[in-house]
């Protein structure tokens, strides 16, 4: 059973998936930094410094106003954190767009390589048609 597991792990697909997950995690950190450190400050500049991740609504409760989402959560209030959700969706859309562009570039490169390969291969000479072969057989049988 251990040998089967080693064989399974050593297969290319499993290794490719592991590398993809590791690179994906690192890529997610880069995109999160892009959004948090570069895009959000620019958006904040146009919206008067509003931090969207801090937008929330307290559900129920005693009417206490909290200064931040962290303070509300720390106090144990039930919150609807719509700002954090919207920022997560925004991060996802940026990641999806970048991945789409990468896949598109890879597909174009593969298509270009396939076209070059097809152009480099000379066309195989056409062999005799079925009719030609049958005529040859007929002629040999006549002799």
Curated annotation (Swiss-Prot):
Q: Which InterPro entries match?
A: Mechanosensitive_channel_CS, MS_channel, MSC/AndL, MscL_channel
List the subcellular locations.
Cell inner membrane
Signal sequence interval, chain numbering:
none
The protein's superkingdom reads Bacteria
Membrane topology summary: Multi-pass membrane protein
Per UniProt, the keywords (alphabetical) are:
Cell inner membrane, Cell membrane, Ion channel, Ion transport, Membrane, Transmembrane, Transmembrane helix, Transport
The entry's cellular-component GO terms read: plasma membrane
Residue intervals passing through the bilayer: 14-34, 83-103
Q: Recorded GO terms, molecular function?
A: mechanosensitive monoatomic ion channel activity
Subunit comment? Homopentamer.
Cite the PANTHER family for this sequence.
Answer: LARGE-CONDUCTANCE MECHANOSENSITIVE CHANNEL, MECHANOSENSITIVE CHANNEL MSCL
Q: What does this protein do?
A: Channel that opens in response to stretch forces in the membrane lipid bilayer. May participate in the regulation of osmotic pressure changes within the cell.
Q: Tell me which family the UniProt entry assigns to this protein.
A: Belongs to the MscL family.
Q: What is this protein called?
A: Large-conductance mechanosensitive channel
What is the organism field in this record? Ruegeria pomeroyi (strain ATCC 700808 / DSM 15171 / DSS-3) (Silicibacter pomeroyi)
Gene name linked to the record = mscL
